[in-house]
Each structure stands twice: as structure tokens, then as C-alpha cells.
């Protein structure tokens, strides 16, 4: 798979006379990959527990169209009527907008989170407690939410939305801040690798030679610095979606490795029956995974 990917990259580089490997193009590819990676992070516990979610793309589309609808049709009139004094244009974190625009974006995020929770509650209840196969439930959700997108939008583009909301998905972090973050990430990588090595020694696990752990940390650090110095700072800086992806990944890693719920997920995925006989509420695990 890796060899095939490298061959494809080389082919596109030859076809485009090297444009494929320019920072601007790689930056756009990383942004698109980050959005998919955020969805993939949420899919990991679903797959680990032996389930599936075919509706994730349709759910994202449905929630996105609800947010756009609220931003275009509901929030401007609602906030403009309640806070007319906040309609004046101003600058917020370097973005030209109004305070009502900032409030609108905050409300949109709340709406998106609530909508996602409701979908998760619905799917989780049907799969975990009513014992309907996940394939059937999420396939139905795939079709239903795709239809919901057409119902809400009427098949038309809903725009424009607030600049602050656009900035979350399309904005960049200043290059100097991105470089500082990269140095911090590299430091955290080495600390994490060495801490993990000490933990293995503490609990009696076999340890690899120290140079292997250092090479592992160095390889990860090299990838991080290459991304920041060549791809990100070679264009406009680190993309906001990439930063969000990293934050979500750190939170997810902590939950799965350092919490009871995370260990329950892996226990369920390893042996469902043994997990149930151990007194763990397996239905609740599946329910939470879909939320």
C-alpha cells in the first residue's frame, strides 16, 4: 500500500512538472486529509467494538447543512433583533466580522454538537438496546440523512456563512506560532516515548534498546518538522483543521489509554462474552461509542 502510494505521488509529480510536491498543493492535501482524519478518529472505537457506521458521511453533511441554514436564515434576524448594537463591523482575532457574527458562530457550534449527540443517541439506542444490526441502522441513517440534506437545502447552496465559521475550516495559524507549536510537539514526543519506556520497565515488560525508542521519536519529530517548515510555513502556515485534528487525537488517545471506558472498549473488541461475564455493561459501551 505504501509503495503504491509513493508510485502515485511520483507519477503525479512527473505529470504536473513538480507542482504536486509544492507547499501550496501539499498544504491543501493535508487540510483535506485532516477533515477525513477527524471522522476516522471517531470511527475507531466503533470498529474496535466490531460494529460499523455507514452513515457518518451523510450525518456530517446533514449537520453541516443545518448549521448553514441557521447561519443564513435564523441567527442573523434573531441576533439582529435582540442585539442591534452588536451589528457593527469589528475585528475579532484578525477576522473582519461583527460581535453578532461571533455569537452566531458559537451558537452554530452548539447546534452542531447537539445534533450530533441526538444522532448518536438514536443510533446507539437502536443498536445497543434494541439489538438491531449496526449495518441496517446506519445504512438507513445513510439514506435518511442524505435525504435530509436535500430537504433542508432544497438542492441549493446555502451561503454565505459567517467569516468566523469559515475561518475555522479554512484559516491558518501564524507561522511563528506554528513553529513554536512544532517545537513543543517534538519535545512532547521525546518525553512521551521515554515515559512509555519507563512505564514498561516499571511493570516488568521487555524493553527494546534505548536507541530504537530514540529513533522512533526522531522519525516522528522529523515528520512534524518537515510538515511545519516545508508544507505549512512554505505556504500560509498550519491549517486550523490540522490543529483541531491533533487536539482531538490527543484527547482520544488519552481516553482510550488512560480511562476505564477506553479499556472497556478494547476489552469488548477482544472478547465480547468475556467482557459481559466480567460484569461490564456491554450494551452501555456500544451506546457510548455511537454517541
Task: Say what each PLM segment does.
Residues 283-291:
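Transmembrane alpha-helices
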Residues 246-269, 286:
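Membrane-cytosol interface at the C-terminal ends of specific transmembrane alpha-helices
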Residues 82-99, 142-256:
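Transmembrane helix-bundle core of multi-pass membrane transporters
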Residues 4, 8, 34-43, 63-67, ...:
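Alpha-helical transmembrane segments in multi-pass membrane proteins
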Residues 49, 106, 114, 118-171:
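Helix-loop-helix hairpins in multi-pass membrane proteins, especially solute transporters
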Residues 1-38, 74-107, 206:
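Membrane-interfacial amphipathic/re-entrant helices at transmembrane-helix boundaries
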Residues 9-14, 22-79, 122-135, 274:
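Single transmembrane alpha-helix segments in multi-pass membrane proteins
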Amino acid at each position: 500500500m505504501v509503495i503504491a502510494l509513493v508510485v502515485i505521488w511520483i507519477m503525479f509529480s512527473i505529470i504536473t512538472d513538480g507542482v504536486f510536491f509544492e507547499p501550496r498543493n501539499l498544504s491543501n492535501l493535508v487540510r483535506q486529509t485532516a477533515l477525513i482524519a477527524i471522522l476516522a478518529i471517531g470511527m475507531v472505537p466503533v470498529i474496535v467494538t466490531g460494529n460499523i457506521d455507514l452513515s457518518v458521511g451523510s450525518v456530517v453533511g446533514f449537520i453541516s447543512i443545518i448549521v448553514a441554514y441557521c447561519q443564513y436564515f435564523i441567527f442573523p434576524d434573531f441576533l439582529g433583533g435582540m442585539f442591534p448594537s452588536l451589528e457593527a463591523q469589528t475585528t475579532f482575532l484578525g477576522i473582519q466580522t461583527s460581535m453578532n457574527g461571533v455569537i452566531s458562530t458559537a451558537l452554530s457550534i452548539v447546534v452542531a454538537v447537539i445534533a450530533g449527540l441526538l444522532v448518536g443517541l438514536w443510533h446507539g439506542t437502536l443498536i445497543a438496546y434494541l439489538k438491531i444490526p449496526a449495518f441496517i441502522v446506519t445504512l438507513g441513517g445513510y439514506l435518511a440523512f442524505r435525504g435530509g440534506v436535500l430537504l433542508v437545502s432544497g438542492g441549493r447552496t446555502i451561503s454565505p456563512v459567517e467569516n468566523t465559521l469559515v475561518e475555522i475550516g479554512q484559516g491558518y495559524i501564524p507561522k511563528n506560532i506554528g513553529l513554536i507549536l512544532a517545537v513543543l510537539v517534538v519535545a512532547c514526543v521525546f518525553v512521551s516515548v521515554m515515559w512509555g519506556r519507563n512505564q514498561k520497565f516499571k511493570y516488568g515488560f521487555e524493553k527494546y534498546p534505548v536507541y530504537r525508542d530514540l529513533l522512533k521519536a526522531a522519525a516522528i519529530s522529523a515528520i512534524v518538522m518537515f510538515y511545519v517548515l516545508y508544507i505549512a510555513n512554505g505556504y500560509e502556515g498550519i491549517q486550523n483543521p490540522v490543529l483541531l485534528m491533533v487536539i482531538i487525537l490527543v484527547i482520544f488517545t488519552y481516553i482510550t489509554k488512560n480511562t476505564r471506558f477506553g479499556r472497556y472498549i478494547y476489552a469488548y473488541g477482544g472478547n465480547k462474552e468475556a467482557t459481559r461475564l466480567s460484569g461490564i455493561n456491554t450494551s452501555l459501551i456500544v451506546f457510548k461509542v455511537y454517541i
